[in-house]
């Protein structure tokens, strides 16, 4: 149990730092859409999709790696709370269209990236 807790801790910290770096680099590029948060959510959705696809086929993988990558890293990287706050900020500024676009792109994009990862993994392992 301690190994699993440490894996979540290490993965979560690493994912959080990655999210912060993405936000620092990309959020200033566009005033209405926080591109760093979007990138974090899309990358995290892709990684978790690939992870779940891989772990479902590779049943001998140590559970420590599973929680390090999915619960830890992807949990720290992706951020529904920051995304939600940014949508509220856009609404408070009267930017309804940008707020709706942000919701649409984050949600649909995350679903699409997860599905893409599953598809790519399946295609690459089909023999």
UniProtKB/Swiss-Prot annotation:
Source lineage: Bacteria, Pseudomonadati, Pseudomonadota, Gammaproteobacteria, Enterobacterales
GO molecular-function terms, A-Z: fluoride channel activity; metal ion binding
Keywords annotated in UniProt: Cell inner membrane, Cell membrane, Ion channel, Ion transport, Membrane, Metal-binding, Sodium, Transmembrane, Transmembrane helix, Transport
GO CC terms of this entry: plasma membrane
Transmembrane segments annotated in the record for this chain: 4-24, 35-55, 71-91, 103-123
Localization: Cell inner membrane
Alphabetical list of InterPro entries matching this protein: FluC
Family assignment from sequence similarity: Belongs to the fluoride channel Fluc/FEX (TC 1.A.43) family.
Modulation of this protein's activity: Na(+) is not transported, but it plays an essential structural role and its presence is essential for fluoride channel function.
Pfam families on file: CRCB (PF02537)
Function of the protein: Fluoride-specific ion channel. Important for reducing fluoride concentration in the cell, thus reducing its toxicity.
Main localization, broad class: membrane
Catalytic reaction list: fluoride(in) = fluoride(out)
GO biological process: cellular detoxification of fluoride
Superkingdom of the organism of origin: Bacteria
Entry protein name: Fluoride-specific ion channel FluC
Membrane topology field: Multi-pass membrane protein
Record has Ion transport as a keyword: yes
Keyword Heme (UniProt): no
Binding site for Na(+): 75, 78
